[in-house]
């Protein structure tokens, strides 16, 4: 089939959660279909585009910039139009013009919108069956985020937008021929937005073990590690909660333990905290994360808001890392407490779980082995993505 894959970010290199998911779907689709990728790009990504052209039938891109001053204009437009801010912000005339040109040249069988932001573009592809690939139930993610915020302008904005997102997401899920959800929990949330039940294809986010070799951790590995894009509000909330509520308990027993916070664009407040306390190592983006994995006695995902599946958990398990997360953090992932990971939801319990991994090397190694085996048997992309073909055939009759 002729597939048009629409992405909000270029899915290569797979250096963030959404890009990992899309990258593995793209690889799978390119093996079986004539795949055209259309994506927004930021800055000079010519090397990444060249690599993607070796995999896809064609790659087309549209530049996009994000500026705080522009966001104020999009917020005003969102208020006036009563449409979700995220959708208004990514509605660009240049993308619509490119798609009009491509659709005049090619009759696509499938318009595959990767994430809700790109659904508005799939809608304009004539004659194609529309698929929404939902990385999460976006309305629920923003509702959970709003629930964690104190009173203030940010809470008002998120509280307004999750309600608009719920209405918008529900409409898309009713109108598109096919929906891909990453978990049963997300399927339920999407159906709530629709106001009705519907058939959806539930496919977990998948990874490629060939790209995720087992990490040989240092014998004296004793750092705590968090990896994630640090401009993403759920990650900011998670790291701040860990620093404020959990780390002081850990430091009572191990006062010199270092917390490595690795990820793109950390907020200035977090950078300043790292400058004031040498035990907080705020790195920003790093090309090679392996040295941080090697030093880590515990990998943490202390998330309290968000939705979908946490790719960082899949990556860490695939590389044999001992891991502590919250119940919400491992939502949608078939892990078992004390077998594959440690799960804790209160500061005291989370601190105790981290301390167990830092002090019990045998337990840490055991969890790492079992976690990697879980990924091998359940979350490898070659098997996990196969139902996409079934969905394509179904929607094309």
Predicted features and spans:
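Conserved catalytic-core segment of nucleotide-activated headgroup transferases in glycan assembly
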Residues: 192, 202-295
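A short, well-ordered alpha-helix in the C-terminal region of glycosyltransferases
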Residues: 363-378, 384-389
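N-terminal subdomain of nucleotide-sugar transferases
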Residues: 1-62, 105
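Donor nucleotide-sugar binding/catalytic pocket of nucleotide-sugar-dependent glycosyltransferases
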Residues: 139, 158-214
